[in-house]
Amino acid sequence: MKVLASVKRICRNCKIIKRNGVVRVICSSDPRHKQRQG
């Protein structure tokens, strides 16, 4: 998981969600696209 200041969708399967006040990107097609804002 990448921890970035600015999270962006990498592909069309990426979803931006907010979990416990933390913005995250989850991806069903490529787990390497996972990101967290921090």
Curated annotation (Swiss-Prot):
Keywords: Ribonucleoprotein, Ribosomal protein. PROSITE patterns: RIBOSOMAL_L36. One of its GO terms (molecular function) is structural constituent of ribosome. The keyword Flavoprotein does not apply. GO terms for biological process: translation. GO terms for cellular component: cytoplasm; ribonucleoprotein complex; ribosome. The keyword Ribosomal protein applies. Pfam families: Ribosomal_L36 (PF00444). Signal peptide: none annotated. SUPFAM superfamilies: Ribosomal protein L36. InterPro entries: Ribosomal_bL36 (IPR000473), Ribosomal_bL36_sp (IPR035977). Belongs to the bacterial ribosomal protein bL36 family. NCBIfam families: rpmJ_bact. This is Large ribosomal subunit protein bL36. It comes from Cupriavidus necator (strain ATCC 17699 / DSM 428 / KCTC 22496 / NCIMB 10442 / H16 / Stanier 337). The gene is rpmJ.
